[in-house]
Amino acid sequence: MKINNQQRTGFGYFLYGIQLALSPEIRRFVVLPLLANIILVGGAIFYLFSHLNMWIEGWIGQLPEFLSWLTYILWPLLALTILATFSYFFSTLANFIAAPFNGLLAEKVEETLTGKKINDDGFTAVLKDVPRVLAREWRKLLYILPKAIGLFLLLLIPALGQTVGPVLWFIFTAWMLAIQYCDYPFDNHKIPFNDMRYKLKQKQGKAYGFGVLVSVFTTIPILNLIVMPVAICGATAMWVAEFKHQR
């Protein structure tokens, strides 16, 4: 595989992640994150599609009569919001379960891109590092949950929740997904969570661009099953090109 560590747009890093995930050097490290994502996200999407129409009809039914003309606009918007929410929630759960293997995937991608070893201790070191890695995932959840709860409450407000809420939720999801996946290469170098967020904010355009494309892919059936390893590969490419030299 031809290595290219040039700087890209946020979209570009995600698309490069597809190329990296399919490369011979990386493929075997993709398997476990991929399986975790298929089992959890696949099951969630199957359940979602069997209930989606009922939920949306009930939600739109809360609109005041004078806003009933918005139904045709809100139906697809609410469908995308629910899809993104479900996919994000179960992707987060899959990421939590597969966190040690996600970190290993990010490590191998970085080694492929830079030609330099990050850790020489092997798989035993990965197992020993599990408690610290899970603590980091918990730290991410503590950052995300208050904001997610606030936005969820906004969605329950008639009219406002059905119009402004989905847009704000999509923006929020894009940022959270950027944090979720970019954190793996940062964490491999033991960079504190708050420092990682600060560095991403310095390149917010690229972080949001990356998160938006990840968010879109999580709403597309079948494609959402491969998002996790692809996003990790793309986020690691972003780390190498944009942030590694800042350490």
Curated annotation (Swiss-Prot):
The chain crosses the membrane at residues 29-49, 66-86, 141-160, 164-186, 212-232. InterPro entries: CysZ_sulfate_transptr, Sulfate_CysZ. Disulfide bonds: none annotated. It is a multi-pass membrane protein. One of its GO terms (biological process) is cysteine biosynthetic process. Coiled coil: none annotated. GO terms for molecular function: high-affinity sulfate:proton symporter activity. Pfam families: EI24. Keywords: Amino-acid biosynthesis, Cell inner membrane, Cell membrane, Cysteine biosynthesis, Membrane, Sulfate transport, Transmembrane, Transmembrane helix, Transport. It comes from the Bacteria. GO terms for cellular component: plasma membrane. Its main location: membrane. It is found in: Cell inner membrane. PANTHER family: SULFATE TRANSPORTER CYSZ. NCBIfam families: PRK04949.1. High affinity, high specificity proton-dependent sulfate transporter, which mediates sulfate uptake. Provides the sulfur source for the cysteine synthesis pathway. Belongs to the CysZ family. This is Sulfate transporter CysZ. It comes from Vibrio parahaemolyticus serotype O3:K6 (strain RIMD 2210633).
